[in-house]
């Protein structure tokens, strides 16, 4: 994900929400969300809720966020009552919700204020904290592509997975008392199509492919040029979503409103907190390649990031998935109630539903 091109339009969020999480106990979930940084994020203060692994590789204790206080309870607009009913004084004050602090920057305007957007999905980690925390072995990582999924037949809703995930990108469905998460739109990628969030991104910030595909743009951004970095790699989960750090902020102004040449409006210590010490080299490479493009008109890296052709951003070989399915004797993306939350749950699930006030 190229953070220099994200405009915070939430089209990716809407694409995911309308496809996966607008019904059946998932209403409060945002498998994809776009956060304003610096900000509290979603769920609230997720970076402070624990989980992940320490330097010795031991799973760290984490906190399960509260649905109402930390995620925000979704609502339906009562359009008919508002439009045709009696005029009443509102008696409910909103207290929290996704993107509560959207577009709220920090610093002093206009000298050094800033913010930028961070789109977040499940990182489909190589060493998932959610998987390690689950006592039911209900979370598994697919061998063919590394997608991390929840087996809803095995899940008992203990929520250890939520505590174990340092990114808090796995959620509890109170309707079926089970945990659910981003599935990277695997029915789409098995057909050679990108996830809905990536397909609908108007800023063309999302590249999707295999890390070992040396001809792919993901490989070139992560391994060849090393300008795409994982978010909070210090959590020890080896996340597989990579970010090109923001370098396009204007310089700072001094007290008289004059430009301070060479100044960074976004503090480098904040970027290092998010993306680790390698962010300095990544930013140097990005700036050097940009100058190279200006001077010579040529830069493979800049061409990749500009993303002239939408289809070039996604390298998902349908034939690969078909060969795997044939070898294993399975059908691709079967219609399976395990991935249809709330469907026929009256007979399928016998677990207690947690009620929230």
Which residues does each PLM region occupy?
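Non-ligating segments of multi-cofactor redox enzymes
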Residues: 1-357
């Amino acid at each position: 994900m190229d953070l220099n091109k994200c405009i915070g339009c939430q089209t990716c969020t809407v694409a995911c929400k309308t496809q996966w999480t607008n019904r059946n106990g998932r209403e409060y979930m945002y498998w994809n969300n776009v956060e304003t940084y610096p900000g509290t994020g979603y769920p609230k203060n997720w970076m402070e809720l624990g989980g992940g692994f320490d330097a010795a590789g031991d799973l760290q204790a984490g906190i399960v966020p509260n649905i109402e206080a930390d995620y925000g309870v979704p609502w339906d607009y009562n359009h008919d009552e508002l439009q045709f009913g009696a005029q009443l004084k509102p008696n409910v004050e909103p207290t929290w919700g996704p993107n509560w602090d959207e577009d709220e920057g920090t610093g002093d305007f206009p000298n050094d204020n800033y913010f930028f957007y961070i789109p977040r999905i499940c990182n489909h980690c190589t060493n998932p904290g959610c998987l390690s925390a689950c006592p039911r072995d209900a979370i598994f990582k697919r061998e063919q592509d590394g997608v991390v999924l929840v087996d809803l037949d095995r899940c008992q809703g203990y929520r250890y997975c939520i505590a174990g995930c340092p990114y808090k990108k796995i959620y509890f469905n109170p309707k079926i008392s089970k945990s659910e998460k981003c599935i990277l739109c695997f029915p789409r990628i098995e057909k050679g199509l990108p996830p809905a969030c990536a397909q609908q991104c108007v800023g063309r910030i999302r590249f999707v492919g295999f890390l070992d595909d040396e001809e792919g743009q993901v490989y070139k951004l992560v391994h060849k040029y090393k300008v795409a970095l994982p978010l909070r790699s210090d959590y020890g989960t080896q996340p597989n979503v990579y970010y090109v750090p923001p370098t396009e902020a204007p310089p700072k102004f001094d007290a008289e409103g004059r430009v301070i040449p060479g100044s960074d409006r976004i503090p480098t210590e904040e970027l290092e907190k998010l993306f680790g010490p390698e962010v300095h080299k990544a930013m140097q490479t990005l700036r050097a390649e940009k100058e190279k493009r200006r001077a010579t008109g040529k830069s493979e890296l800049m061409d990749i990031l500009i993303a002239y052709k939408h289809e070039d951003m996604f390298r998902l070989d349908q034939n690969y998935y078909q060969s795997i399915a044939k070898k294993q004797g399975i059908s691709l993306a079967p219609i399976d109630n395990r991935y249809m939350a709330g469907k026929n749950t009256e007979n399928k699930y016998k677990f207690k539903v947690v009620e929230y006030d």
